[in-house]
Amino acid sequence: MPNWGGGKKCGVCQKAVYFAEEVQCEGSSFHKSCFLCMVCKKNLDSTTVAVHGDEIYCKSCYGKKYGPKGYGYGMGAGTLSTDKGESLGIKYEEGQSHRPTNPNASRMAQKVGGSDGCPRCGQAVYAAEKVIGAGKSWHKSCFRCAKCGKSLESTTLADKDGEIYCKGCYAKNFGPKGFGFGQGAGALIHSQ
């Protein structure tokens, strides 16, 4: 198609792109309606685009197509390995430092006249010392990771089975298990 006006051509459809409908990326121009991932057809913007040659992708599709391949690379939760590396002599040890919460917290709250009971210590939690996390009221001093004891904030916690954890301990204890996950490259050393 001839380009009579001398304007820029869209990197996808090769038709003329006018200023009002133009999106620029890596020196190329695109129609707003053509600025889509080549694979999944999601709309792109400057924060979500990944370029390979003259093809444009969303970051997710780009990673799947051109990212690292092989064992242990993130293809999603459906493909995680449950191999613990035992065939390579790696031993997995369960931590026993878990301190369970008080199972009688609700009875304690009734006993003290309606104030909430702290799930960690079972004592009444009054407004001046109350922190809310995982849908429960905690003392500020009890609002700590159940594994490592690190102080938490309502935005930095993860909860499981009524207990609260820092993001690191939660990932180590309840995240994906298996060879190549969660320990970093130093743990992948194999010595004979």
Curated annotation (Swiss-Prot):
A motif (Nuclear localization signal) lies at residues 64-69. PROSITE patterns: LIM_DOMAIN_1 (PS00478), LIM_DOMAIN_2 (PS50023). Pfam families: LIM (PF00412). Signal peptide: none annotated. One of its GO terms (biological process) is muscle tissue development. Most prominent in tissues that are enriched in smooth muscle cells, such as gizzard, stomach, and intestine. Lower level in the heart, no expression in liver, skeletal muscle, or brain. Keywords: Cytoplasm, Cytoskeleton, LIM domain, Metal-binding, Nucleus, Repeat, Zinc. It is found in: Nucleus; Cytoplasm; Cytoplasm, Cytoskeleton. It comes from the Eukaryota. Heat stable protein, that interacts with zyxin/ZYX. May be a component of a signal transduction pathway that mediates adhesion-stimulated changes in gene expression. This is Cysteine and glycine-rich protein 1. It comes from Gallus gallus.
